[in-house]
């Protein structure tokens, strides 16, 4: 089974212009996957200006017309940034990107998905293990997130829902600057975290560093319906049939009748195996 993540999307592209030299630091590369016969070009958004320069001097040879795919970034793409990218590359036919906040006829949103497999919280074997367990849904709403990921947005969420749905994990999260502390924390907690999601009908998923959040897709893979606030990308995902509840403000959560019947109505016959690149093209 393929999990949606930045690495998965990159490997759909014949020309891949970004890699990682270690767990944290990305690097511009010029890699042509000869096994893929397509005009898809993958680039981390932060390197698009550099790519334009390299293309002009001939260091990178882009197709005359191509489809761009950007991922592995927290940049939210609004109208101004979209125009900037098309000014750099007027020969783009289609562009697929995460964190898309503006409607454009040539640009389509793709999910952040789960963490990349180079990260401990993107360990796909761990996901498959929990997905293979039979989890009876015994919890209505699961609330567990690191407020420090996006303090303003996440405190807003917490302040508006905590009377009814308090934060379940009040343990201190590790120092984000330490990869080892992060990995130790994930290795000791993620299985139970995923099990709690799987046992819950609904999972609260406030925005992350970018508007999309790994938790949204962790919930979907655990067959829990994510509750998110509205932005362009999630509206499009919902239109594709991906089960989620979209609200405009977290104060609305208290008015939702979050029942097993609502879960069944929204989830319907959705199959997580349909989550692949073709769904978003």
Where are these regions (language model features)?
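Short alpha-helix at the nucleotide-sugar/activated-sugar donor binding site of glycosyltransferases
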Residues: 220
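A cross-kingdom feature marking charged/low-complexity
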Residues: 250-261
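Conserved acidic donor-binding segment of nucleotide-sugar-dependent glycosyltransferases
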Residues: 244-250
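Nucleotide-sugar donor-binding catalytic core of glycosyltransferases
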Residues: 1-214, 225-243, 260-281
